[in-house]
């Protein structure tokens, strides 16, 4: 149950904070990090060694897909994000070609960080038309982390 904890995280929005280790991104249609209607996230889970996406549906988080963390698999994660409609710009107001069907306006992007003291930090970004580049930056950043972490040889 990888996503169970997500439902209990702060629902009041994202606080701005200096970044630590980038561990995930959440796309919201309501301004909250984890939207309880159309929210979903793609996160880097160092414990289970995979990227996963989650959808909040019928009052519970549902895991959609696992992607093993290897040097090139961030590209598959980006492809998954595109499939799920993450790159739809806020002003397009059209049904997602992916799994999330809504005509609501995308209003927030949260980057999820893990600070050196293990605090989880949510950095809120306004979805102002730069959503696509924000997501690409996230995956490029994540790719760099995965390439670095993948060479440590940790079991």
Residue ranges and their predicted role:
Residues 1-12:
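Sec-dependent bacterial lipoprotein signal peptides
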